[in-house]
Amino acid sequence: MSSDPLWGDPLSEAADSVTVPFPGELGDVTAARLAAAGYLGTLALGQPPASAEHRDDILLAVSELAANAIQYAPGPFVLSLRRTFDGIHVVVADTNPDPPEPRRYHPSKGGGIGWHLIQALADEVSVVPGDDGKEIHLFLPW
């Protein structure tokens, strides 16, 4: 039985970062979360999170970013995670150059909380528009 992750190259215990491209299909929300979980699991072997909640917050933020990329920026997206001095830098690059627009939450319509949730979870959030899309950068505690 192979111990290689499902999403690509195996990560070493000393992995400082991981970058994974996705085609932008519905199943990629789960795949992005699994890729992040694999990276964080490997990272935790050498540097455990200060709180178990930090891992869960990062996974939730990755899921929300991936879902937003699929819904609002049709096409491929790239997920990157990198260890920083005191946390994790998450980047999602997608094909839509427009910055996210927060929506009001409507219980009957669903949705509307993802961007607010991302901003609440992260210590810092920035959006970097480009000619071919944008990058959303999050810094979360670890």
Regions inferred by a protein language model and the residue ranges of each:
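Extended, non-globular alpha-helical segments
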Residues: 17-18, 23-43
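Residues at secondary-structure transition points
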Residues: 27, 49, 53-56, 60, ...
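Conserved short strand/loop->alpha-helix "switch" segment adjacent to the catalytic nucleotide/phosphoryl-transfer site
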Residues: 34, 39-63
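Short, well-structured hydrophobic secondary-structure segments
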Residues: 61, 66-71
